[in-house]
């Protein structure tokens, strides 16, 4: 199984790059984790946000390999505590399909992305900045992996 993070935005602050890269390199070779960045649509004063979201959504879905499980990151999604996420990760491994996690831009995800998802995951009831979500997802998935392998990273 491979994990893929598909996120809107290509120019992230250094702290995002550093934090995400730190967790990315920790993943074992048998659980590769890749990042696919989608350029954000230009948002000006009179921008058609619905059209921008639709275009971003098309690009995100085009980046998902056929057969992948799609999991959106969205406030109304399921709130998984860490042990539950570890169980979820094990189920995904047993399913054998790759998993693509979708993180929207400033206005969230396109309706087509939400409609195409098999699952939706909420990190918090708070609205989080989309760059921060990248780091939180990477850390959460790494922690879940550490639980499934009895790695000492996670402590109760």
UniProtKB/Swiss-Prot annotation:
Subcellular location: Cytoplasm
GO (cellular component) term, any one: cytoplasm
Cross-referenced Gene3D superfamilies: 3.40.1280.10
Pfam families: SPOUT_MTase
Reaction equations catalysed: pseudouridine(1915) in 23S rRNA + S-adenosyl-L-methionine = N(3)-methylpseudouridine(1915) in 23S rRNA + S-adenosyl-L-homocysteine + H(+)
Keyword field: Cytoplasm, Methyltransferase, rRNA processing, S-adenosyl-L-methionine, Transferase
Tree of life domain: Bacteria
EC primary class: transferase
Main location: cytoplasm
Disulfide pattern: none
Record's function text: Specifically methylates the pseudouridine at position 1915 (m3Psi1915) in 23S rRNA.
Family to which this protein belongs: Belongs to the RNA methyltransferase RlmH family.
Description of how the protein assembles with itself and partners: Homodimer.
Full protein name: Ribosomal RNA large subunit methyltransferase H
Originating organism: Sodalis glossinidius (strain morsitans)
Gene that produces this protein: rlmH
